[in-house]
Design a protein with these regions (language model features):
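Glycine-rich portal/gate segments that line the openings of hydrophobic small-molecule binding cavities
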Residues: 38-79
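Intrinsic-disorder/low-complexity, polar/charged segments enriched in Ser/Thr/Lys/Arg/Asp/Glu/Gln
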Residues: 2-6, 43, 58-60, 73, ...
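Hydrophobic/aromatic beta-strand elements that line small-molecule binding cavities or substrate pockets
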Residues: 5, 34, 61-67, 90-98
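Hydrophobic ligand-binding cavity/cleft-lining segments
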Residues: 1-43, 51, 168, 174-189
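Beta-strand/loop substructures that line and gate deep hydrophobic ligand-binding cavities in soluble
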Residues: 80-127
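Short, Lys/Arg-rich cytosolic juxtamembrane segment immediately N-terminal
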Residues: 162-169
């Protein structure tokens, strides 16, 4: 399965990169996320609880970042397991392009899924994937507005999510994580 998309962000490219590399920001923004931890250089583990139609499951996953070109692009390799509910693996190419209004996030996800969730109807899976993606970006927009207010975009505002970042994880990785979760759901048909 392949999924592509773009999203206009209200923050500058570097600010988006920084926010996407902040595990606390990502934890707040990814629906159902209860854990994001560094497990090596440019490697992370995460836990997410999701409900897709009649199927509820806790997914554990690994993310590895490659082809990093800060603050412009990277490739995210992922795999996730939800027990009998299903599994998913794949890659996501992510780009942050500067625009006059802030920056544009572009992504292309290639994923494979299987298990019980793969047996659900395509329309249900598509709807959940779209809903998760929209919820992530809604939360991300709100969080970046708190961190980088329009009236003073040079000085971040202190908030619980603006604590020191874990080394090696750009903020866009978390956005990609949300896209990956949505892609996993989308491909589990």
């Amino acid at each position: 399965m392949e999924m592509q998309g773009t999203r206009q962000l209200k923050v500058q490219q570097q600010q988006a990169w920084d926010a996407l590399n902040n595990p606390e920001v990502l934890k707040v923004c990814i629906p159902g996320c209860d854990r994001i931890e560094a497990s090596g250089e440019n490697e992370f583990s995460m836990g997410t609880a999701l409900k897709i139609g009649p199927v509820s499951a806790k997914f554990s996953g690994k993310i590895m970042l490659t082809d990093m070109n800060p603050p412009a692009s990277y490739t995210l390799n992922f795999e996730g397991q939800g027990g009998v509910a299903g599994f998913g693996k794949g890659t996501a190419a992510v780009e942050l392009m500067p625009t006059p209004e802030g920056c544009e996030l572009r992504y292309t996800v290639n994923a494979q899924v299987g298990g019980k969730i793969a047996q659900l109807g395509q329309r249900l899976i598509d709807g959940v994937a779209k809903s998760l993606s929209e919820e992530f970006f809604k939360r991300f927009d709100a969080e970046t507005e708190r961190l980088y207010p329009v009236q003073d975009s040079a000085a971040p505002v202190e908030s619980p999510a603006s604590q020191p970042q874990a080394q090696g994880w750009p903020n866009w990785v978390w956005v990609v994580g949300a896209v990956v979760v949505a892609a996993l759901i989308y491909t589990m048909r």
